[in-house]
């Protein structure tokens, strides 16, 4: 389903953003 693909993209982007925030906090 298209919405599942979009959901995966959003989750992947959110995970990437969260990871960037965590790395920034640790640095």
Curated annotation (Swiss-Prot):
It is found in: Secreted. GO terms for biological process: defense response to bacterium; defense response to fungus; killing of cells of another organism. Disulfide bonds: none annotated. The keyword Secreted applies. Keywords: Amphibian defense peptide, Antibiotic, Antimicrobial, Cytolysis, Fungicide, Hemolysis, Pharmaceutical, Secreted. Potent antimicrobial peptide with activity against bacteria and protozoa. Also has activity against fungi. Also shows activity against enveloped herpes simplex virus type 1. Probably acts by disturbing membrane functions with its amphipathic structure. Binds to healthy erythrocytes (this binding is receptor independent), and has strong hemolytic activity. Does not bind to P.falciparum infected erythrocytes, but accumulates within the parasite. Kills the parasite, and only at high concentrations has a hemolytic activity on the host cell. In vitro, shows high spermicidal activities. This is Dermaseptin-S4. It comes from Phyllomedusa sauvagei.
């Amino acid at each position: 389903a298209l919405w599942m693909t979009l959901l995966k993209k959003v989750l992947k982007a959110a995970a990437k953003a969260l990871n960037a925030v965590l790395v920034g906090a640790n640095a």
